[in-house]
């Protein structure tokens, strides 16, 4: 047992003894639930922060606050609530009563205070403690003041401590909430209807990913946590709901990385009588307005860069992007779609770039992997990449001029994909053939290939109007709005490997 652990255990024992004494002298068994908190720290600071000491004393303002004790400086306590911090002052009479009744107040305890508002000699607002109550005794100490909670893994595993002591974390999750609310408000103003679709599917679909499998005992069938809501949302468009969206969780049984968490949040939407170009226009409008609304400017700092959400955003095909970011590769510079269709040519190109390839990769998969290897991380500013091959876009409509590619884009910012959208494939026979090709790919070893969904084909046979749909990764978008570089910093409780 380390000295640090011994010290912590000693502090915990001391606090438990204090709680036991409190229980012996408190009718609420040490956890009262009757304090009426009427005011928040930030509201008090905003309303009275500019008053002089004399003005406050003359006004006789009484305020009732509650929160966690974050510091003790002589007779002063720093109390933190959800809005911020404010001081409370314990005069001599109060200090004496506090000691007799509670046998010592510790950092981390939650208290309620009522009293008159004053200004300290240093110009700080404080509440003079006329009434007070210990609401919750903290049995464990907070991290030391100067060391804080610096271990990243502990921050993720014990997010409750992280939120108490790290203002940056609190601000990041407040921003996350604002981003989600702003997106929802934008969609409603655009006359989209918010819906909820199943989280458990009998057939996983809507994306190329490995699902989590579970079992429904009553029905005695295998079920899958959804990897995407796409096929259900498009069924609703078939049913006549022309503009729908859903903000919810998706689950993909894949690896962990700074960009990936197996449980993540997606906003997916579909609009009838539109195409993928309409989606790009809508995305520009949405992100520009949200950035300006929440941050006061469409230009946001991100690492060493400044990301400009103001638009217009760059648009180029996947093939052109590969050429742009490989200017000295003669083979790439002369490459045409005819060569992209040649799987041996693409295999040799990938190998020449030092890439490890899978034997079942198609021409489209090879093109996408080369793009990811050589171009994706260069896309710092908002960029729509178009021209995705049909063999990696089984739900997207083929391009009228080039049937090898589809009317699909992925949206990149900060060197990573944030959104994926396309004109929907509404040809039931073409969709049937593409599902069958996905089954063949799965049989060949591609774990992420899609399953065949007969009911979705039946829905298409009833007629899906010309439709465009898009999914936006909320977590990755929030990373940009909070200037964070790992997805775990914007997910309250990210997936972690079990300890021990």
Swiss-Prot record:
Its cofactor is Mg(2+). InterPro entries: Aa-tRNA-synt_II, aa-tRNA-synth_II, aa-tRNA-synth_II/BPL/LPL, Lys-tRNA-ligase_II, Lys-tRNA-ligase_II_N, Lys-tRNA-synth_II_C, NA-bd_OB-fold, NA-bd_OB_tRNA. Mg(2+) 2 binds at residue 417. Keywords: Aminoacyl-tRNA synthetase, ATP-binding, Cytoplasm, Ligase, Magnesium, Metal-binding, Nucleotide-binding, Protein biosynthesis. It catalyses: tRNA(Lys) + L-lysine + ATP = L-lysyl-tRNA(Lys) + AMP + diphosphate. GO terms for cellular component: cytosol. It comes from the Bacteria. One of its GO terms (molecular function) is magnesium ion binding. Binds 3 Mg(2+) ions per subunit. It is found in: Cytoplasm. GO terms for biological process: lysyl-tRNA aminoacylation. Its EC number is 6.1.1.6. Homodimer. Belongs to the class-II aminoacyl-tRNA synthetase family. This is Lysine--tRNA ligase. The gene is lysS.
């Amino acid at each position: 047992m380390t000295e640090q652990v011994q010290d912590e255990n000693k502090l915990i024992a001391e606090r438990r003894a204090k709680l036991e004494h409190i229980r012996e002298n408190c009718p609420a068994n040490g956890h009262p639930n009757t304090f009426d908190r009427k005011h928040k720290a930030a509201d008090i600071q905003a309303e009275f922060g500019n008053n002089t000491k004399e003005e406050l004393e003359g006004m006789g303002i009484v305020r009732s606050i509650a929160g966690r004790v974050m510091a003790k400086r002589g007779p002063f306590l720093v109390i933190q609530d959800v809005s911020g911090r404010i001081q409370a002052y314990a005069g001599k009479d109060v200090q004496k009563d506090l000691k007799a009744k509670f046998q010592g107040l510790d950092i981390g305890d939650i208290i309620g205070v009522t009293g008159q508002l004053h200004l300290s000699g240093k110009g700080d607002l404080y509440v003079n403690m006329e009434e007070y109550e210990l609401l919750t005794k903290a049995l464990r100490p907070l991290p030391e003041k100067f060391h804080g909670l610096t271990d990243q893994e502990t921050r993720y595993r014990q997010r409750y401590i992280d939120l108490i002591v790290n203002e940056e974390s609190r601000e990041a999750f407040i921003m996350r909430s604002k981003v989600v609310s702003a997106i929802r408000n934008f969609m409603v103003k655009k006359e989209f209807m918010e819906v909820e679709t199943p989280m458990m599917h009998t057939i996983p679909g809507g994306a190329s990913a490995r699902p989590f499998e579970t079992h429904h005992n009553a029905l005695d069938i295998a079920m899958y946590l959804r990897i995407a809501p796409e096929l259900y949302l498009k069924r609703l468009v078939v049913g006549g709901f022309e503009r729908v969206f859903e903000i919810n969780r998706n689950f993909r049984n894949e690896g962990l990385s700074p960009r990936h968490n197996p449980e993540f949040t997606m906003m997916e939407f579909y609009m009838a009588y539109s195409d993928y170009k309409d989606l790009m226009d809508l995305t520009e409008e949405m992100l520009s307005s949200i950035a300006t609304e929440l941050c006061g400017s469409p230009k946001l700092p991100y690492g060493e860069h400044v990301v400009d959400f103001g638009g217009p955003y760059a648009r180029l095909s996947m093939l052109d992007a590969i050429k742009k970011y490989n200017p000295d590769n003669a083979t790439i510079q002369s490459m045409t779609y005819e060569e992209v269709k040649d799987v041996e040519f693409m295999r040799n190109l990938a190998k020449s770039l030092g890439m490890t390839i899978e034997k079942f990769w198609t021409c489209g998969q090879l093109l996408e992997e080369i793009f990811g290897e050589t171009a994706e991380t260069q896309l710092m500013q908002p960029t729509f990449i178009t021209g995705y091959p049909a063999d990696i876009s089984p739900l997207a409509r083929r391009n009228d001029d080039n049937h090898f590619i589809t009317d699909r884009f992925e949206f990149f910012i900060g060197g990573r994909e944030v959104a994926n959208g396309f004109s929907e494939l509404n040809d039931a026979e073409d969709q049937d053939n593409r599902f069958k090709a996905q089954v063949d790919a799965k049989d060949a070893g591609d774990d992420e290939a899609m399953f065949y969904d007969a009911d979705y084909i039946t829905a298409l046979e009833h007629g899906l109007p010309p439709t465009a749909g898009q999914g936006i990764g909320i977590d990755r978008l929030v990373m940009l709005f909070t200037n964070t570089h790992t997805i775990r910093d914007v997910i309250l409780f990210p997936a972690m490997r079990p300890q021990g």
